[in-house]
Amino acid sequence: VGDVTIVTSDSRFRLSETSLGIPPAQIAPFVRERVGLTHARRLMLTGARFKGDEAVNFGIAHLVVADSEELEEACNEILSDISVCAPDANAFTKNILFESLRRPRSEVLDYAAAGFANCMLSPEGNEGVAAFIQKRKPYWVEGSLRK
């Protein structure tokens, strides 16, 4: 399961396990989380084929582009966007999101608050706030002067 998934309009998908006589056991929970129970049932029980635009509609992909050239451009844009975000902050953000699937909301809020405080006191957090105040790029951004 990718954080950001880009497909071409002619990308082809199929959850074909049941047509092979086996259940989609390993992927089923992830597909159900991503597309919902109703779509997961149809896609898995029929082995339905679908293309890139439908993958976006199902929530399997985030963006559909016309061809491989546009795919490379879109990937570069996404990577550029990610590169301006602090690596540790992104890692903890992913942890919060995954914990929100496993824990009650009140526990996740406590977990997130503690992590926020730790990040604010970390070298990365200090650098991010200082860079913002000083109107400069933080050290993790390509092309910044500080490392």
Feature annotation, model-predicted:
Residues 109, 122-125:
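Amphipathic alpha-helical segment in the mid-to-C-terminal domain
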Residues 1-88, 126-130, 136:
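Crotonase-fold acyl-CoA enzyme core
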